[in-house]
Amino acid sequence: MNVRMNHASSTTHMRFIALVAACLLAGCGGGESPGDGGVDGDGSTPVWVGVIGTGQSLSVGAASNGLVFTTPWPGSYKLALGARETTWPIDATDPELSLVAVAEPIRTINTTSYSAPYPINIYGETFHSAMAAQLDTINRAAAGAGGGVGGVGLTSVHSVVGQGDSSITVIRKGGTGNAYAASLFEASALTRLVAAAGARYEVFAVMLTHGEKDAELPSYEDDIARLQADYEQDLQAITGQTRAIPLILTQQHAEPVTGRSTSTVGAWKAGVDHPGKIYCAGPKYQYAYAGDRIHLLAGQYDRLGVKYAEVAHEIVVRGNDWQPLQPIGITVEGQTIAVRFHVPVPPLAWDEAFGAPHQFVHAAWKNGRGFEIEDSQGEVTITGATIDGDTIRLGIDRLPDTTTAPLMVRYAMTQDATQLAGGLVSGRFGQLHDSDPLIGADAREIDCMMTSGSTQATAAAGAFFGRAAHDMVEVVGGSGLPPDTTVVAMGANIASLSQPWTGPTGPARLRFRSNQWNYAVAFEMAAP
């Protein structure tokens, strides 16, 4: 079976790539005040790119337990509502509205309701400030890397309109909530305000962080496609832009507690079936979750923002046909099932830091490293999983039986736990990843005390705020930790590492950064 690969999008999209490259070469972004930015086709008007974030609670920072990106990022913006911050509807021409540098919180944090509509919809650290920082940083770093963007910044303008605990039937066009209407309001207001600042506002991408509420909604993929098409049509009418507006999303893995999630598969398939329009940026099972095991910690929202920025930059600015680590074909030869993958950054590898799923429940798959196989007889025992270039070869203990049901290959789709288990190996989890070396704008150097032979790093109280399990750790300007050392547990002032310290006992400066490897999407496919 083959999965269709995404291909280059429309001519207007390619024209915009050339436009952005030209704008950046001319000195786009990175300014301290409105007026800095890119240029349009006539070489005179700066272009500021809009990012619209919609979804449910993970799109608005629920359970982040604090704020990290609180310092305004120069050259990237959000809409300030002034005296209108708690009212709706709002007139896009209201003089209370203004542009301010993006920082967390996006607006005043709501502490009284878990599912409030825009503009009182913010619950903590969103991914947007980290995304803005990463877009600017990655653009500056792209000089000489084939991106044609010349080492200058990228001005982004962020809108956060999602509503916690809400189905796509709430946030879509004509939905029962106001998220979609708020998107159009912000786009209208920003078009006016950015023009007054001497630039032009165009929507760069819509980011959809969603799916838990609709975990068992059969129409989810079609609903995503409709949302993208509606956004593109309505936003183009407001901004006057002609290029496509991609929708970029990630998969959810927490819901349902029992059974399998149609929204998880739908989020991946939407990118496969709607090339150039929808892009799945990958899964989130590899993230560190809050104590409720459905939301993320503050630093992990930032990790998500870095990944969103990387994917959006590859698609829109560099014009690359970015795809996640996803299956593109399955073949069966006797008792071996070969799953071939598109690999963003080879080589493939296994994440050994947190163990393998299905060690107690669904034990037939305990050697599958996240892979799951079923046929007419039920669960098929996996005897081993081996990396062979871009292919995973799965050994099974008998020939497949397809007399009454197809041979199904799944990955990170079934959990062992009987409660919410986001980020745990007892939840929906997998170990396969690529080798993306990206160091995000959320990286931070921390002075630690190390003990030779110990896996513990100790720092001053509060120094580890915003860091979490799954972070990568390196020694700054020295040695003492092997490559790919990972934080396996994080306390208030103690980080437990996956590898022991090999240097002498004493102080060391360590760099903690989010893990930006691309992990394999959760999927299910019928083998031929």
Predicted regions and their residues:
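Bacterial signal peptide processing site
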Residues: 29-32
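Autoprocessing Asn-cyclization modules and mimics
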Residues: 339, 440-504
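C-terminal motif of bacterial Sec signal peptides marking the signal peptidase cleavage site
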Residues: 25-27
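Intrinsically disordered, low-complexity regions enriched in serine, threonine, proline
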Residues: 1, 12, 506-510
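Cell-envelope and extracellular/periplasmic
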Residues: 38-448, 492-494, 500-528
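Bacterial N-terminal signal peptides that target proteins for export
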Residues: 2-17
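Hydrophobic helical h-region of N-terminal Sec-dependent signal peptides
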Residues: 19-23
